[in-house]
UniProtKB/Swiss-Prot annotation:
Superkingdom: Eukaryota
GO molecular-function terms, A-Z: DNA binding; DNA-directed RNA polymerase activity; magnesium ion binding; zinc ion binding
Organism, scientific name: Emiliania huxleyi (Coccolithophore)
Signal peptide stretch: none
Binding-site residues, Zn(2+): C67, C69, C82, C85
Subunit structure: In plastids the minimal PEP RNA polymerase catalytic core is composed of four subunits: alpha, beta, beta', and beta''. When a (nuclear-encoded) sigma factor is associated with the core the holoenzyme is formed, which can initiate transcription.
Database matches in SUPFAM superfamilies: beta and beta-prime subunits of DNA dependent RNA-polymerase
Gene field: rpoC1
Name of the protein: DNA-directed RNA polymerase subunit beta'
Function as written in the Swiss-Prot or TrEMBL entry: DNA-dependent RNA polymerase catalyzes the transcription of DNA into RNA using the four ribonucleoside triphosphates as substrates.
Subcellular location(s) per record: Plastid, Chloroplast
Amino acid sequence: MDRSFDYVKINLASPSRIREWGERKLPNGQVVGEITKPETINYRTLKPEMNGLFCERVFGPVNDWECHCGKYKRIRHKGIVCERCGVEIIDSKVRRHRMGFIELASSVTHVWYVKGRPSKIALILGMTVKELEQIVYFNSYVVTKANKDLNLSYQQLLSEADWLAIDYNDDFSLKENTISIGAEAIKTLLKNVDLQQSASEIRELLPFAKRFFSEKLIRRLRVINQFIASKFDPTWMILDILPVLPPDLRPMVQLDGGRFATSDLNDLYRRVINRNNRLARLQEIVAPELIIRNEKRMLQEAVDALIDNGKRGRAVVGLNNRPLKSLSDIIEGKQGRFRQNLLGKRVDYSGRSVIIVGPELKLNQCGLPSEMAIELFQPFVIHRLIYEGLVNNIKAAKSIIQKNGPLAWEILANVMEGHPILLNRAPTLHRLGIQSFEPILVSGRAIRLHPLVCPAFNADFDGDQMAVHIPLSLEAQSEARLLMLAPNNFLSPATGDAILTPSQDMVLGCFYLTANNPSQQLNKNHYFSDFEDAILAYQNSQIHLHTFIWVRCNNVDLTEDETCSQTQSGNLILTHGADIKSKQSSSQDTKTKYIRTTPGRILLNEIFQ
């Protein structure tokens, strides 16, 4: 299909529209599309049965440019319709989009509009869902044409005994009353609904209705207005024609042992066709009304199971007592067609792994596992190997990569330098849910992430996963570097507040590094020539993280406060304070300064610098 489109819209389809989907006129003038047989493939020839669920005449040939009987083969016969089997010579890909249809012997309701919340049919007709189900599933009759003389009001429900009393009465006036049951009765009632008049009547009643009834009237008015605005006919919620999905979307595959694995939809379609054909035969031979009603109810239940298995109650199960997957099960949920295949497609140059903390990283860096990096950047590595003349073809380049030699890792490091990558954590609720980083090769299989960027992703390190994407074009790379780099996104787009803020372990760590430990104030006689000596002493366990020490820092501008006192000893001027000491020769301008601190505060200062 070469048609381009901007959006996908789901709405009601008319019976004529459903027929258009499945009905086609072949080049020889023959009209095909209706499925009349429940069979799938012939057990001897293993070819699709004609007019069955895999019919080649309706859906197209199984093999490219080859008819069912084998008379015509090859593309040179394109467009010809075989005289023997009636199959059009065409590409087999049409079996992915060509649909069929089933002409139902009796109308059935669409289970979504009966059992859905809210029930559209029940709201339009102004009845409860329970009353609607009584009619649809042949438990109660409904008056579709009132007779005031007999006290039969419009939409009045009648039991089996009431209907028999009227049916066996010979009075002509009683026969004038149309009393019906099943989906056909609902269709008649929907035909009689004047949407514009119903909407105006509800608007007149609303000011005088009590709260409970006003809410019910508002819900009904909302549904009626939706039908008026969309110009859909409410009777389209009653099915007379059932569309059949293309066969390649419900395949049947032969296994090694000769058995076949088939889609659950084929079993559900088979139930519908069997019951529909049986109902048609019973109507032809004018079977008793009780039998026909029972068959109509079974057809209704079969269509319900096909559309949404288990919606009404007990689900239809297969051979292993597993509920069969219906059309609704295929399209809904996380594994459904929309979220799995249309909205969340797998893309090339992407990967996924668990994230762990990487406090040693810079804010604009992330740790990319080597195993993932060599796979994602493989095309770039192959191009660089060929460009530099190290190999002559792609096969030789792949051989070098598979050997995990030092040359491959050296080229990979060169390729990754300056090439940003995108990290995304689902769900991406705002634009900071996907940001770019400069990749750093790390061992293991986990992605390492700087802890400060976690609030933007709403991520933590309890097993969260993130996706990696490689921007390919120069435009994408420049956009990733200029706009999406993590240090450039330090403000929340929602509130404008800083989002790169330390929390949890980082706050606790800063507090622990700078905390005062009174027990460490007893020994104040540790002096160090610079900060490096102090850190070296801490690493050698000579002092504790919270030990108070004096460190010489002549290059730091120390402001002496009022608490500092000066004394002179010989030609030395000594300055004493709570956290500051200095000494200066009276004959020289150089001053030796000391500051009281702890190894923890020195470490924090180095981190900030």
